[in-house]
Structure formats: structure tokens, C-alpha cells
Amino acid sequence: MWLLALCLVGLAGAQRGGGGPGGGAPGGPGLGLGSLGEERFPVVNTAYGRVRGVRRELNNEILGPVVQFLGVPYATPPLGARRFQPPEAPASWPGVRNATTLPPACPQNLHGALPAIMLPVWFTDNLEAAATYVQNQSEDCLYLNLYVPTEDGPLTKKRDEATLNPPDTDIRDPGKKPVMLFLHGGSYMEGTGNMFDGSVLAAYGNVIVATLNYRLGVLGFLSTGDQAAKGNYGLLDQIQALRWLSENIAHFGGDPERITIFGSGAGASCVNLLILSHHSEGLFQKAIAQSGTAISSWSVNYQPLKYTRLLAAKVGCDREDSAEAVECLRRKPSRELVDQDVQPARYHIAFGPVVDGDVVPDDPEILMQQGEFLNYDMLIGVNQGEGLKFVEDSAESEDGVSASAFDFTVSNFVDNLYGYPEGKDVLRETIKFMYTDWADRDNGEMRRKTLLALFTDHQWVAPAVATAKLHADYQSPVYFYTFYHHCQAEGRPEWADAAHGDELPYVFGVPMVGATDLFPCNFSKNDVMLSAVVMTYWTNFAKTGDPNQPVPQDTKFIHTKPNRFEEVVWSKFNSKEKQYLHIGLKPRVRDNYRANKVAFWLELVPHLHNLHTELFTTTTRLPPYATRWPPRPPAGAPGTRRPPPPATLPPEPEPEPGPRAYDRFPGDSRDYSTELSVTVAVGASLLFLNILAFAALYYKRDRRQELRCRRLSPPGGSGSGVPGGGPLLPAAGRELPPEEELVSLQLKRGGGVGADPAEALRPACPPDYTLALRRAPDDVPLLAPGALTLLPSGLGPPPPPPPPSLHPFGPFPPPPPTATSHNNTLPHPHSTTRV
């Protein structure tokens, strides 16, 4: 009898542990609905084995307990031969796996080699605390952390109690909770999901929150540009984590058909890239991009080969064959690789996502212009003063930025971001003009403020608005926000606005449980209220795709003071009004955020380049794809692209071959500013005067050459190929005017009488400008042998010889493309490769 009793006890324990393999969620649809929610160490079945979590109480009476599953493997460890390879599904394990402690972080440099300008403020201000989260590092780092609420949170209770807000009808099964996967930032080089505790967000919003570690730096994004190492392994890790969630989250009470990805900084860029990748199709439904897009200068690495060769040379793996170099790097210890100091150009990255033709099929902006959104709902926004770290180096004192420091910073900015030398002076002066407060131009504090706005507008605001506009053009739901609040912390400059990463403590509910080592702020009741507001918006969006529904804004549980967000309805962003929500202590819905400056970067700056192109080039041009990825397949080729917008919108013109330019925003008919009008007027006047000058010069040269030919040609002579006969070159000893002497020297240099004068002097066609906005100056050759055009002979001496080719490290050429080739090593055999 006692044996039978033991068997019955064991059977009951097994049933509490989650049922049989492949079964549903233990104890009912969610942990909070069964006995598991009451256990200290609940056990859940997954497709790969059983995992044991831990129940945690939160430091707030309105928040219920959360079950944490920490360090759940979502992929096979990328060790040995699996380094620089796409991830594989994890192997099954016997028994019960403990998931009660945080997993190791992925290998990264601990010596602060990454420039501070590329990291969030809370990270750089608390480096010692941040270092404690990445002390435990291992190449075996592909793990998830899950935070599962055990009971309905305050938001669900408020929704059910609201008489004017009926229960959400969009939720198919109220027992299944939405899932939110957070992608951490850190310039693709640093960070870990362990830094972000999702417990408060999960408990307050009644959602399952997941964080993850993915491969970083050289181990996550090294690329040779060919099949030896295609790169994007960190992105593939994120896709594998989404596959794991789709397959297993139902066992934890989650809804695999309501998965939202969200991230900040580089994590937000990953969110945008996953939207554009067909490998992630069907794995998530909504996306939140906080302070990051795929079209900023730091989002994509357009020089992967350069930095791979630099790294290989540093560790003794510089080989002529790319496969041999990668194999050598694969044998090196991970610590030796990540500790190498490979510095990128300022405002760029050394190791990050690349356009590989598969995971990232094409330049992200091209994909967005072609509607590669695949029907994702999107919430996107920026902080008020994202560029704080860019300005702190230039601020010499509390009095602000001096005039010389302002000029130097702008010049350095242009030199590092724009690759055509002839137009740099014009662009530099135009930027200074646009970002000078002419009413108070000698005020150092005002110069600091405008410099902060310059970096914020260029690196964050303009790319975010362009992304939202491209998204809305295809009738996809998109909501835009601007974040105008930050917590009070020691050491923070009084003049600083909400900087890069300042929204994160409010998204994760830190004010509700008090200051932490990473966010050592003096949180007030206003901070708690604002955090509740942000979590309500974010989790509403994860539930329905609408941040306003199903839960209304109500924070009376904090204090009796009215919540101003209760009367605010967050409107969708559209291409005409571009509505956005101002998130701060005084919320409001407005339109056309920083419209003048956004138009400057998206319209006037490309227009300045077009004027330069028309002035210095003729009809002889490079092939349209000579300096960028090959064109897409013909329109009739099969694909999964989203259909064009409905007929209710005016059709957008088809892009013409050649250098691209941003499309003008439809409906932007407003008067931008006096400064912008003056700039355009001055530019147009200079263009007109130059055209007149060149016309007169051409006429004068042609007239003199005609007279000279008549003087030098003997009557009735022939034999030179010149009309009228006679030699084209003058007789010995006869002096020529300067402009005729230059023509003579050009003809001699070009091979004498038989040479074509048009072959003597031809400058190159400038590169694609909109890509040059995001590439380092040496990404694209400024002179190419095949791009020759004729300049007037009186303009000056011949130009210098062309510089070396695009990538100075030539031993890694990509293999010749074939019509049927695809990447068999990636998780999916299908591909939209344009090569």
C-alpha cells in the first residue's frame, strides 16, 4: 500500500509540473489560473525539456507576484565550428533544468573601448554598476529570461471595472497573455538582457515579458562579404529566439499570435531590421522602436570587409583567402577577439548588421520605399535631447560652447558623414546657418542648445520621421511619440534634456519599486505616474495594436491629483499631419514634429547635392548600381512584398535610375522658415550666376578655337582630321594664349592629334547621396576610372589621379552571382537576394 501511495504522490507532482511533453500550459491557460502560481519553484514543460522557475514578490502592494524563468536556452551554444554560423535549435535535456539565476552575458570588451557617444546616458553614468552585469561572460550565452505574471494585474482589473470601456473584443482568449520581447541596445557591441528586469512591466500590464542575450561585436556581426562569413549572426539569434517563443510560450500561458518586439537604440534598429527581413515573417505581429531606426548612420555597417581585415591583421589571421581567414579567427579564443580595439569612423560602427542580400535583403531605406513592412503595427519615437553625449565633449564649461568649438564640431560632423569633397564647404556653412540662433548668436549656452538639436535631429529625429512616414504611406498603423522627461540624478547637467535611453526606466516601471543600481534616481510621484502611463500605452499596444485601448489611463491609485493623460487620445501618424504624442508632465497631441529641421535634412540637403551634381557632371554617368547593391529582380518576379497602397492615395512616382533622393512629403506646403528661404534664394542666385559665367566661358573658348583653327589651317589642306585641314597643334616657337595652351597640353597628354579632347579631363560622378548620409567618407570611391565627363578647359589643371578602390583590402572578393544560388547555411532556404 505504501508503494501505491508513493506512486500517487509522484503522479500528482508530475501533473503539477506541467503534464506530458507537448501538452498545454500547466495548471490551465496561465500560471495565475492554476496551482503553479502558488508554488515557490514552479515547473513548466517546453518542447525541449522541463524548466524550474522562481516566484518573486515585488516591492509594491498593487503588483502581484511574478514567476521568473532565467537562463532558458533558445539555441545550441555557438561554440567551436558553430562560431560565425547561424544559430541552431537547442538540444533536449533530461530531468528538470533550473532557471532561477541569470545566464552569462555574451563576450564583450570590458575596457571601455567603445566611444561613450554611442551608448545610453544611464549606462555611461553608471559604468561600475553596468560592469557587474557583464562580469560573467561566456560564448555559451544564447538564453532567454521570462517574466510571467501570476495574477491579473492592475490594468486588467481597471479594464474590467470601467463601465464606459467594455472588455477588449480583439483578444481571442483572455487566458492567453500577450508577449513582449525586449532587444537591448549598446551599439551592437555591449550590453545584456540581464540588465532589464521585466517583472514590474509584466505584473502591471498583465503581459509576459522576455529579454535575451544575443551575440555582439565581432562574434555577432563579423562579415567578409562572401559565403565565408555572411554576418548578421546577432540578428539571426534574435530570430531564433522568436522561433522558440512561437513554439513554447503557450506552455507559460502566452499567446504565440500576439508577440511584440521592442528595443531601444541599437535594439530599436534591430526591431526595424527584423520588420524588413523575410526570415522573421510570422514570428511577431507588432513592433516598438525607441530611439532608433535602420536608416541612421550607426544602424548598418557598409564597410564590413574593412573592419574584418583590420581585426584579422591584429590577431595574425590576415590571409589572402577569406575562408582561411575566417577559419583562423574561428580558432582564436573569444577573449582575444573581443578585446581588440577596432575603432570605426565617428558616427559609424565597426561590427553591426550588414546588407547581406538575405537576412537584410537590400538597403533598409530601399526596402521601406518598396513597402517591405509585411503588415506590422508600429510604435516609434524619440527623446527630446538624444544627442547629449555628442555635445558634452564640445561643452568647455557651464557657460556653453564657444564659437570656435561650434565651428570645429560642425566641420568634424560634415567630414565624417559626407563623402563628396567639392560640396563640403557649402554644406558646412548651410548647417551652421540653420543651427545658429541669429537673435542670440553670441550666447554660448544657446550654441550648446542648437548643437544638441543638430545631433538629435540628424541621428534620431529625421530618420524616425522618415521611417514613420514610409510606414504610413502603405496604410500600416503607426504611432509616433516624443519623450520629454527624465529622472533627477546626481551628476546630471542642469541643461540636459531627456537624453538617449532616458525612457527605459519608465518603460520597465522602475519608479514603482524604487531606485536601482543602474537607475539611481530620486523618483517622485510624478515619475511613478508617468511610468504607469508609459506601461499602459506600451502594453495596450501589445494587446490590440492601439495604445489607447483596451485599458484607459487612470493613476488615482498613486495620488488623487488628476492624470492629464486621461483626456488625451493618441492619434495615428499619417503622412500629411504627422501627429505625435508629447509624453511629459504636460501631455498633448501635436503635429509635424520639428518640421523645418526634418525638411532640411530630408529635402534641402539632398537638393544641395543635386545642384552640385548638375553643375559638375554631364550626361556621362556611372551605371546606377555601380557603387551599391545590384537592382532588385523584375517586378514580375515572385516575392512576399506588401501590395501597393490602395487607390485612395495618390500614386507615388516610380524611382528613376541613378542617384536616389528622398521623396518630398505629400502635403508639405507650409512655409518652413526665413532662414530656409534665404538659403534657397542665395543658392539659386549663385547657380544662375555660375550658369551665365560658364556659358560665356564656353562661347569665348569655342570662338577663339574656331579663329585659331582658321589661322593655322592652310587653304585646301587635309590630313589631320580637323575641318579645314592642317595640324591642330601650333607650329614650334609660336606662343599661345593661356587657355589655348591648356587645350594643347591636354591633347598632347591624351595621345596627340588622334586623341579625343573629351577624354583628357573627366571628373567622377558623385556617389549616391542618400546612402552617403549614413556611410563613412571612404565607403564610396569619389573618383572612378569609368566615370568621365568634360570640364571647361579654362577651369584649371587636371584633377589628381583616382584614389584606390572601394575596399582597400581586395583579397576578399565576393563569388560571382548565379541565378539560382541561395544561402543554404541560413535557417530558411528561400531568399530575396538581389545579387
From Swiss-Prot:
Per the record, where are the segments of Pro residues compositional bias? 630-658, 795-818
Q: Residue ranges under compositional bias (Polar residues)?
A: 823-835
Intrachain S-S bonds: C106-C141, C317-C328, C487-C521
Membrane: is it a keyword of this entry? yes
Glycosylated residue positions: N98, N136, N522
| Extracellular side, ranges | 15-677
> What GO molecular function annotations does the UniProt record carry, in alphabetical order?
cell adhesion molecule binding; identical protein binding; neurexin family protein binding
- PROSITE patterns the UniProt entry points to: CARBOXYLESTERASE_B_2
Q: Which residues lie on this side of the membrane: Cytoplasmic?
A: 699-835
Q: Which ranges does the record mark as transmembrane?
A: 678-698
- Mind telling me which GO cellular component terms the entry cites? axon; cell surface; dendritic shaft; dopaminergic synapse; excitatory synapse; glycinergic synapse; inhibitory synapse; membrane
Task: Please provide the record's keywords in A-Z order.
Answer: Cell adhesion, Cell membrane, Cell projection, Disulfide bond, Glycoprotein, Membrane, Phosphoprotein, Postsynaptic cell membrane, Signal, Synapse, Transmembrane, Transmembrane helix
Where is the protein found, in the record's own terms? Cell membrane; Postsynaptic cell membrane; Presynaptic cell membrane
Tissue-level expression reads: Expressed in the blood vessel walls. Detected in colon, brain and pancreas islets of Langerhans (at protein level). Detected in brain, and at lower levels in pancreas islet beta cells.
Q: Where is this region: Disordered?
A: 623-668, 790-835
- Region (Required for interaction with LHFPL4) location: 678-698
How does the protein's chain sit in the membrane according to the entry?
Answer: Single-pass type I membrane protein
Keyword tRNA-binding set for record: no
Ranges in coiled-coil conformation? none
Q: List residues, modification Phosphoserine.
A: S713, S718
Q: Which Pfam families match?
A: COesterase
Q: How does it assemble?
A: Interacts with neurexins NRXN1, NRXN2 and NRXN3. Interaction with neurexins is mediated by heparan sulfate glycan modification on neurexin. Interacts (via its C-terminus) with DLG4/PSD-95 (via PDZ domain 3). Interacts with PATJ. Interacts with GPHN. Interacts with MDGA1 and MDGA2. Found in a complex with MAGI2 and IGSF9B, where it interacts with MAGI2 (via WW 1, WW 2 and PDZ 2 domains). Identified in a complex of 720 kDa composed of LHFPL4, NLGN2, GABRA1, GABRB2, GABRG2 and GABRB3. Interacts with LHFPL4; leading to mutual regulation of the protein level and synaptic clustering.
**Would you identify the family this protein belongs to, as annotated?**
Belongs to the type-B carboxylesterase/lipase family.
- Can you say what this protein is called? Neuroligin-2
Organism of derivation: Homo sapiens (Human)
Organism phylogeny: Eukaryota, Metazoa, Chordata, Craniata, Vertebrata
